[in-house]
Amino acid sequence: MLFKQPLRSAFVLLCLLAFVEARGQTDSVVDKLDSTVLSARKRTSALALGRAGVQKVEIGGLASIPSILGNADPVRFLTSLPGVETGSELDAGLHIQGSESAHSIVSMQGVPVYGAKHLLGIFSVFNPSHFSTMRYSQRAVSANRLGGEVDLTLPEDIPDRTRLDLSTGLISAQGTLRQALGSGTALSLSGRGSFINLLYKDQIKLGEDPLEYGFGDMNLSLVSKPSPQDILVFNLYSGLDKGQFISKDTSLGINAGWGNTLASASWKHSGLLQQIWTSAYDLSVDIDFNSMGASIPSGIRSAGYRASWEGGSWSAGAETAGYRAQLQYPYLKGITTASPGSAEIQTALESSLWGSYEMQLTPELSASLRLRGSHFLDPERQSHWGLSPSGTLRWNLLSAGKLEFTAGTAQQYLFQTGLTNLGMPCEFWFLAGKHADPQSSIYGILSYENTIDRGMYAIKADIYYRTLQGQVEYKGDLFDFMTGTYDLDRELLKGNGRNFGLSVMFHKQSGRLTGWIAYNVGRSLRNFDVPGYEGEYPSNHERLHEFNAVASWNGRGWSAGASVVAASGTPFTAPDSFYLLGNRVISHFGAHNSNRLAPYFRTDLSFNWFIIQDSRQTLGLNFSVYNATMRENPVLYKLYVTEERQFAYGPLNLGFSILPSISIFYRL
């Protein structure tokens, strides 16, 4: 049964969260106003709720949550929250309230990041020690996107002394240096690299085939405060991933490299923020199959200027950005058939204006209105105009909690699609235009939250519904590349969709023991106006049910954490028959996304031992176990060919069933 094993683990965590009392620690804040005494618990959880579905996470507080493989990754942390789907180890996306990964914007200091996660799902491109705060919202308000928004920001304070944050383990090593350069300037430098295959080469496999993988990234930022009203921030990031595997069954070999590069400069003066930025994502995939092969490069580049202003109840802003996208195209090799063309290059210009107003209607009732207008000049030099109004109504029920309703519309001019079943991130970006019309959405979110026992506990619930227009899915396969018959328009399914669901969370946010239990039930449905695809189908990433439990205990000289995730399997399209044509196996597929992978279940454990812990420095060891129950979670289905030339279609698991690790960390 899907929930039998996780329910046992969840029951233990729930009992701990609800009934264990933290002793020997001051966990209350008391304010005296004349003869009135106001008392509230001191929040020790890294997670804080805000208005309109906005949640803020202090990155420094992530040290109190389970650190897997010596790393408390902020994006992996998000997947344990209600409404954010847990992806497989080969899914590099972030799905918020049923939306596609490309529907949500993930950014670094406000600059879009087009590939936010490293492979295996354990690490993102964000080195935690380099950032101060993560802001997460269920809807994108700073960009033309249909989904949510995640932004990691840099610290703006000037350190009073040299700061170091170093960690090395069996999987990776990372470090951050923060150094003051005078009284008003600070430099931050971070680097990270993996050596997964050094010790785990025989454990990390895709099925029975070895998967070679590694990544590295670097951050450099400079903060300057020339006056009390001015802050200058310069930021640079570069990262690279490389992966390779060869299938013994099919003689299929894939060698891929991908990475992000971005830079930005911003100036904040009083309530005005101005920024220039550039961001790029490049993907190169080489495929070899028997005597055939193909090189498939793609990528996207963008650069822009943004200005925003806040003053009292008003805020406003403007942004313009240029795009250059290289679409996926196979350059054939090893066969006589030459590639009939070359990769398509798209260029476009996107501009936006927005404004918002906050108002207090009554002592218990407040509202905010927001209007965003956009213009997109597509690659064919056709203009597309969009107007996205939205509004939020908040009702303070005093001791009964807070109720909030948000509704609005959204536009989007970027797409991401491609092959998802090769074991490598082979999806590419393209721009609205001749291949697909701009996307749009109408959404509504009803939220409730309340705190209990002077802030010791918090509960939160969301009901959401979102319509999606102008959706695409990629239906092609690998052999379209090899035969020289590749045609992007022929491989795209076009239609509409809708997401709806309910998510709830119980959060213990004070005391030595903190954590939460979250549950989400929802649908992510798509329909395509294509013969043979009548009706509604679940999206490729849909999880009908998902349960998450996270618990952390901070003791004296040690800390421990555990997390449990249990979720329904994601859909896939299975073949109902095979036949052999020459040396090629031809599959006849059944109904689109009518099958599902087995349910996903994983338990992670973490323990920190602080050898030295004082006001100046911390030295410790981290012991962690990824997938402690050794559950084998399939990541996709594939065609197997036996030595007797028999065919079978079965699940493919990522080779490691359990991944223990030890790391040493030092903070100054």
Per-segment meaning from a language model:
Residues S302-S308, S342-W354, R454-A518, E546, ...:
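Outer membrane beta-barrel strand-and-loop segments of large Gram-negative receptors
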Residues A566-G582, R602, W609-L668:
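C-terminal beta-signal and adjacent terminal beta-strands/loops
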Residues L49-F126, S132-A140, P155:
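Periplasmic N-terminal accessory/gating domains of Gram-negative outer-membrane beta-barrel systems
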